[in-house]
């Protein structure tokens, strides 16, 4: 089978970096270098070039989709003779631990909020919808954090469903990576945003991923556009270990950190522990629960070294 025939058979349009960058058209750069520095993750090299060549074309595409969605809503309101409720456009961002989902989410939030049509862009991570440590310990799931059974999926689905139903406001629990737990009474209020960006390991999962907790509605049912941030397994492992080493010298040194004891490790000991955590927990979760959802995404961004995106696949 020729490459052209294979391309015609795939559900995705495929772009290399140069082809994707050309789709920026004339969209202006609205972020400064200082802003980009604040947006990037602890383990990433995010440059103006990366934002210009990858994220500006993506924000342009999303703006087209969002504008089309608003026109569709207006047609429905005209047909029904109703006043429009503010229904957010929901973008989900999935991918492995350490792949850079949070940076992608923050950059898109910053770029999309600068478009004149939709200023109010909220970002919520699904970490907040993990069961509290007390519940996970009771159920023997502390080593399964991030796996499907560790989430309060009913609460997450209700949160997204409420926003899509046009409720004036909804609350989302907030997770602290410092204390490695959901913050008690730390809920964040989300009030009718134009766009909601939902970032997490589990946002592309569906009923087949939750056989232990059967229910009929899932987060993915409410998502308008989904992004999967992808990278080769060996890079993900390397990024995870490097991030762990940086935390060892930074966040873990805080006496309040759940992982404060890790700050006392030698570099060799830290690498051994990070490698073990990757192999026994994160790699297993990736293979069993995250990677199988990749082909459900509207768009797949594939990263190479230094977290630079070298391929984009867009669902036809």
Curated annotation (Swiss-Prot):
The keyword Kinase applies. Its EC number is 2.7.1.33. It is found in: Cytoplasm. Belongs to the prokaryotic pantothenate kinase family. InterPro entries: P-loop_NTPase, PanK, PRK/URK. Keywords: ATP-binding, Coenzyme A biosynthesis, Cytoplasm, Kinase, Nucleotide-binding, Transferase. This is Pantothenate kinase. It comes from the Bacteria. CDD domains: PanK. The keyword Nucleotide-binding applies. ATP binds at residues 95-102. Pathway: Cofactor biosynthesis; coenzyme A biosynthesis; CoA from (R)-pantothenate: step 1/5. It comes from Klebsiella pneumoniae (strain 342). It catalyses: (R)-pantothenate + ATP = (R)-4'-phosphopantothenate + ADP + H(+). GO terms for biological process: coenzyme A biosynthetic process. GO terms for cellular component: cytoplasm.
